[in-house]
Amino acid sequence: MIQFVLMDIEGTTTSVSFVFDVLFPYFRDNIQSIASRAEEPEIAAILKQVQDLALTETGTSLDQTGAIATLHQWSVEDRKVAPLKAMQGFLWEEGYKNGDFRGHVYPDVLPKLKEWQKEGIQLGIYSSGSVKAQKLLFGYSDYGDLTGYFDYFFDLKVGQKRDVQSYQAIAQAVQLPPEAILFLSDVPAELDAAIQAGYQAWQLVRPGTTASPTHQQVTDFGAITSLH
């Protein structure tokens, strides 16, 4: 019996276009604004992480301007690195709170969250976006604050989403056997890693998603039948 449903965000609970057409451009349009605030502790810590990672990866020593430019470039490349995700979360928080945008959630998601919560099934998010960014998206969603439906939020601190060890670590964190966990994602490689860890895993085939012939599929949350 499934006791925990773990969900991806982009392409699963949320439209890919919201991320690529709203969130990413907002970040790139506003990244230069942090130059005048580089002494703020949170910003300074993230820039230091950028400098450390650049030094490790390329041997390049970056000044503040170079670190900001690198964040912009990483965003263009959609790099899955922690400093970028942290800075995105920082700037997106301001956008959400200013009402510049609201977090997109597919209309079929909330009814299922309510149903699962009522049945006593625990719910969690696992995304490459930082936990902060995850909570902002669901906290300022089209349907209001949905964060109360989720028991856990996981990001890249637990590991990369295509690594089996990441899903093993999540199972340990929620203190459940892997076979009691259902993972929902649109990405076959992520589903494969979860399955190798012992999870059940289904592919969400949203508009624009290529269906995988090797995975169980649903087109929306409403198509997910009883988990008992």
Swiss-Prot record:
User: Which keywords are on file for this protein?
Assistant: Amino-acid biosynthesis, Hydrolase, Magnesium, Metal-binding, Methionine biosynthesis
> Which Enzyme Commission numbers does its entry carry?
3.1.3.77
**InterPro entries of this UniProt entry?**
Enolase-ppase_E1, HAD-like_sf, HAD-SF_hydro_IA, HAD_sf
**Per the entry, which co-factors are needed?**
Mg(2+)
Instruction: Give the similarity note.
Output: Belongs to the HAD-like hydrolase superfamily. MasA/MtnC family.
This molecule's function is given as: Bifunctional enzyme that catalyzes the enolization of 2,3-diketo-5-methylthiopentyl-1-phosphate (DK-MTP-1-P) into the intermediate 2-hydroxy-3-keto-5-methylthiopentenyl-1-phosphate (HK-MTPenyl-1-P), which is then dephosphorylated to form the acireductone 1,2-dihydroxy-3-keto-5-methylthiopentene (DHK-MTPene).
* Protein name, as recorded: Enolase-phosphatase E1
Organism equals: Picosynechococcus sp. (strain ATCC 27264 / PCC 7002 / PR-6)
Gene coding for it: mtnC
